[in-house]
From Swiss-Prot:
One function term, GO molecular function aspect: translation initiation factor activity
GO cellular component, one term: guanyl-nucleotide exchange factor complex
Family, similarity comment: Belongs to the eIF-2B gamma/epsilon subunits family.
Keyword check for rRNA-binding: no
A GO BP entry: cytoplasmic translational initiation
Chief location category: cytoplasm
Alphabetically ordered keywords of this record: Cytoplasm, Initiation factor, Protein biosynthesis
Cross-referenced InterPro entries: eIF2B_gamma (IPR051960), NTP_transferase_dom (IPR005835), Nucleotide-diphossugar_trans (IPR029044), Trimer_LpxA-like_sf (IPR011004)
Name listed for the protein in its UniProt record: Translation initiation factor eIF2B subunit gamma
Function: Acts as a component of the translation initiation factor 2B (eIF2B) complex, which catalyzes the exchange of GDP for GTP on the eukaryotic initiation factor 2 (eIF2) complex gamma subunit. Its guanine nucleotide exchange factor activity is repressed when bound to eIF2 complex phosphorylated on the alpha subunit, thereby limiting the amount of methionyl-initiator methionine tRNA available to the ribosome and consequently global translation is repressed.
Quaternary structure annotation from Swiss-Prot or TrEMBL: Component of the translation initiation factor 2B (eIF2B) complex which is a heterodecamer of two sets of five different subunits: alpha, beta, gamma, delta and epsilon. Subunits alpha, beta and delta comprise a regulatory subcomplex and subunits epsilon and gamma comprise a catalytic subcomplex. Within the complex, the hexameric regulatory complex resides at the center, with the two heterodimeric catalytic subcomplexes bound on opposite sides.
Length: 404
């Protein structure tokens, strides 16, 4: 596909997940042990796009290059990747696109580094062509999400409000909850489109197909900083001007297109996609292999709907359900792991129980400890028989844990 460029945004800091992004940039956060950005890169490559620009902070460029090479994605999907280094001053996505507009020379498929899906984006691109759209935003009502560990909150609701012309899918309004603080004014759109559905059913996946000519106009706009909060609403409003040729659409991701889709920009969605994407993992990231398999009769280890890396050591009589265990972990005998993410180099003692938790790099959990619905930050220690529940465990908090 030579008429479009892929734009992959990897410069964001991950402010909604500070306990995880304090030690690693969001684009490098591991999802089933693989840096997050490789998933949207795979999506672009599977679409057939051969010209991809990756916007990244300069200090991370070499790391991203190494991870791309290691992934062998370019061996399967040949493409040219250009890394564009951005500065701290490029605060919003629109700022970034404006400041580097000379690098964008075609219609573009813009994808955030936290878009994780096994779905094909080819139907979206086909829709973009067929409708001669100015902008097409990918939306989905099946984005995986869950309450974040470390809290007692209920399952989060969708956070985007949008108005869609039911007959065509044309977008008449789009706003995220962070920006939804003003009265909703839709007089112009209702005059043109009398049948509009206002809904919060869908998530904006932060995947946009957009015409090059409007990106050129963006480069001349001094007062636009955010792509979604500023530029997309501007384009939507311009549809209603006399003689306007601008058309903005929402493309609903069909349920039959893929098994898993996530906009993993929160702790809850990040946590859940680590578990959900495992069913498609070996197809998306072939270079990682199949991981460890166990025969309960001979190994005395029960592992269900889980991925365990080859370098992990699991002792007998352990039970692992819908979890991920990363490289160089040591799991003691008679441990129970359920609905949890175990990062690199974690040591878990005999008889410990971990449920619905994220255990970060280098954590040590003592024998017979019980960790439920928690995030245990990098290099923390939970003592033997320690019990911690609904907590974010960081530096200086170990003295508060109970020893039952």
């Amino acid at each position: 596909m030579h008429e479009m460029q892929g734009i992959l945004l990897c410069s964001g800091g991950g402010t909604r997940m500070p306990v995880l992004t304090r030690h690693v940039q969001k684009c490098l956060l591991p999802v089933v042990g693989v840096p997050m950005f490789l998933y949207p890169l795979s999506s672009l490559l599977r679409t057939g796009i051969t010209d991809i620009k990756i916007f990244v902070r300069e200090v991370l460029q070499l790391t991203l290059e190494k991870e791309v090479k290691k992934s062998k994605l370019l061996e399967k999907y040949p493409a040219h990747i250009e890394y564009i280094c951005v500065n701290q001053e490029d605060f919003g996505t629109a700022d970034l696109l404006k400041n580097h507009h000379s690098k964008i020379t075609k219609d573009a498929l813009i994808v955030s580094c936290d878009f994780i899906s096994d779905a094909s984006l080819i139907p979206l691109v086909d829709f973009f062509r067929a409708t001669n759209s100015t902008l097409v935003a990918l939306i989905a009502d099946t984005c995986v999400n869950a309450p974040a560990p470390g809290s007692k909150s209920k399952k989060p609701k969708a956070t985007d409000v949008m108005a869609i012309v039911e007959s065509t899918g044309q977008l008449a309004f789009l706003c995220g909850d962070d920006d939804f603080d003003a009265p909703l004014v839709m007089e112009k759109s209702l005059k043109i489109f009398p049948s509009i559905k206002l809904t919060s059913k869908y998530n904006d996946c932060h995947v946009y197909a957009i015409r090059h000519k409007v990106l050129l106009n963006l480069s001349k706009s001094k007062h636009i900083s955010s792509f979604k909060a500023d530029f997309v609403p501007l384009l939507i409003d311009k549809q209603f001007e006399p003689d306007s040729d601008i058309k903005c659409f929402a493309y609903r991701l069909p349920h039959e297109n893929g098994f898993v889709t996530a906009h993993a920009n929160t702790l809850g969605s990040y946590f859940e996609v680590n578990k959900a994407i495992q069913k498609s993992f070996t197809r998306l990231m072939e270079y990682r292999g199949n991981g460890k398999n166990f025969n309960y009769k001979t190994d005395k280890i029960a592992a269900h709907e889980s991925r365990i890396e080859e370098s992990a050591e699991i002792d007998k009589d352990s039970v692992i359900k819908r979890s991920f265990i990363s490289d160089n972990c040591r799991i003691g005998e008679k441990t129970k792991l359920k609905e949890s993410i175990i990062a690199k180099g974690v040591v878990i003692g005999n008889g410990a129980s971990i449920s619905n938790s994220i255990i970060c790099d280098g954590v040590e959990i003592g024998e017979n400890a019980d960790v439920t619905n928690c995030i245990v930050a990098k290099d923390q220690k939970v003592p033997a028989k320690g019990k911690v529940q609904n907590e974010v465990v960081e530096d200086g908090e170990d003295e508060e844990w109970t020893d039952d």
